[in-house]
Amino acid sequence: MKKSFLFAALVAIMCAFSSCVNEPTILGKWQMNTMKMQSIVNGQVVQTVEEPVPSEDPIYWQFVDESTGKIIEYFDGDVWTDEFTYTLNDNILTITPRESSDISITCQVLNLTETELSLTQIPEGESEYYHQMTYNFTRVTE
């Protein structure tokens, strides 16, 4: 009886560990491929513009988990900055400047695999007219 209980406990621990290991992670470096902007008026999409990010002017986001807090590094073609922190809970990504926590960008994670990340910005408050941004990334492996 004791052996079967220990075996069952070991199997449960191994199953729990393997399910955690196999889940994709947002940590790492991502290159933005496309940006899509939808203009929305009274709940209706009135215009959609989707453009690739030029390879000669790349945009990177790098998600870093440091002991002092989660940092997002951003590269806009000229310089890396690490002025932002992030949280990721229940497929909701919130990005906040380190210096001003009263301003933030909130996105829903539409897709997260080992190689792809898609985010759509959640509009703040209710408005008759707003732009909804969607970003698509691929993981950079070096």
Model-based region annotation:
Residues M1-S19:
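Sec-dependent bacterial lipoprotein signal peptides
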Residues C20-E83, N89-E142:
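Lipid interaction determinants
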